[in-house]
Amino acid sequence: MTKNKPSTAEKTRLICQNKKAYHDYDILEKFEAGIVLLGTEVKSLREGRANLKDSYARVRKGEVFLQGLHISPYTHASYNNHEPERVRKLLLHAHEIKRLTGKTQERGLALIPLKLYFSKGKVKVELALAQGKKLYDKRESIKRKEENRELDRLRKRRRQE
């Protein structure tokens, strides 16, 4: 008899998110990229010990590298542990890298990681092509969110009456 294989549905598990990126940047486009990791880094990510805050990606010599990603050392490893803040290579298609190179150089856009997650057993990074917000833009978006919350509260009260 053959064993039933697990469904081929996309199995994803979120490791960490960069919520501050949505506040500080206007997200224009999103990409999914693989990431080159060491064994202890993957084990540490399975424990959920990562931080995307203040991380960004750069294109150098036709390759994309992620800087500032903090993956805490694996607790059960001995002397073979990894460096927590090392530069990690991202895996993208060549045509995507060319596109990103052009856009980041021309318009002054930034490559910001939004999420780090497991997809079918592999660690993936959701990268965003983003433009930095000015201070007044941030204030405006906060004001808009507060107004929407107030409207929702009023609607809820009317429904209850």
Swiss-Prot record:
Primary residence: cytoplasm
Entry-linked InterPro entries: SmpB (IPR023620), SsrA-bd_prot (IPR000037), SsrA-bd_prot_CS (IPR020081)
Positions of the UniProt region annotated as Disordered: 139-161
Organism: Syntrophobacter fumaroxidans (strain DSM 10017 / MPOB)
Name of this protein: SsrA-binding protein
Key words, A-Z: Cytoplasm, RNA-binding
Pfam families hit by this protein: SmpB
Top-level taxonomic group: Bacteria
Homology family: Belongs to the SmpB family.
Record's signal peptide: none
Gene Ontology BP term (one): trans-translation
Taxonomic lineage from the root: Bacteria, Pseudomonadati, Thermodesulfobacteriota, Syntrophobacteria, Syntrophobacterales
